[in-house]
């Protein structure tokens, strides 16, 4: 199964060049959101899960914000899109 990943979070700028920030992951059937995060961690040689757990990086899945702590065991489907973003606040 293929899942599209886009790394838009500021934290990834030093790890991947602009042209490489969007790519497809090949994952086995039944893979979860947590499996995808671990695959990206392995690919980048970086720890992403702690950033997600602290809320420094968030994931949008198919244009909806995901609570990683609650949904890391969510099973992915072929064609799902994951965007890693930096949360923005202000007023």
Swiss-Prot record:
It comes from the Archaea. Pfam families: ThiS. SUPFAM superfamilies: MoaD/ThiS (SSF54285). InterPro entries: Beta-grasp_dom_sf (IPR012675), Mopterin_synth/thiamin_S_b (IPR016155), ThiS/MoaD-like (IPR003749). CDD domains: Ubl_MoaD_like (cd17040). This is Uncharacterized protein AF_0022. It comes from Archaeoglobus fulgidus (strain ATCC 49558 / DSM 4304 / JCM 9628 / NBRC 100126 / VC-16).
């Amino acid at each position: 199964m293929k899942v599209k990943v886009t790394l838009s979070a500021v934290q990834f700028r030093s790890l991947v060049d602009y042209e490489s920030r969007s790519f497809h992951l090949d994952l086995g059937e039944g893979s979860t959101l947590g499996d995808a995060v671990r695959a990206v961690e392995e690919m980048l040689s970086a720890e992403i899960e702690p950033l997600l757990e602290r809320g420094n990086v968030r994931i949008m899945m198919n244009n909806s914000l995901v609570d990683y702590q609650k949904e890391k065991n969510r099973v992915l489907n072929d064609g799902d899109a994951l965007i890693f973003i930096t949360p923005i606040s202000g007023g």
